[in-house]
Amino acid sequence: MRTDIKKSTDLSMTHVSGWEEEDKIFYKSLNKNIINYEKTRGAMYRKFILEETEKTKVEDSGYQIQRTKPKEYYVWHHDQASFRSRRLTYIWYLNDVKDGGYTQFNTGLKIKPEAGKMMIFPALWPWMHRGYPPKTETKYIVTGWLKC
């Protein structure tokens, strides 16, 4: 991993022996949240996921646990990049972070890390975002993508 772009510790837990139970828990939670996302963002969901790809099957990429220590970061980026099949990004915050550590979008919106909060947004270039460094506490998230 290039530390000028991203500095954190990442662990992919999908298809890793010993992580099957956690994988099932995240899968159930993701499905519940995607159903809610589709209800509240139906037109956007259908446009970005189904119409543009002409596909009806959507799958998740699995789950990556990320630990970001104080002063670690992820620079401005979008999640589609060279992975054209990525359509939505999902991020679960696993702990509260009091100072810094937020996800910031290029619109100025800042999402504070709060345990149990999940965020879903398009993985496309208009949703540029970054992981702002936590100042004093370590931040834990689980992230992944819906793809077609």
What are these regions (language model features)?
Residues M1-M118, P126-C148:
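Fe(II)/2-oxoglutarate oxygenase catalytic core
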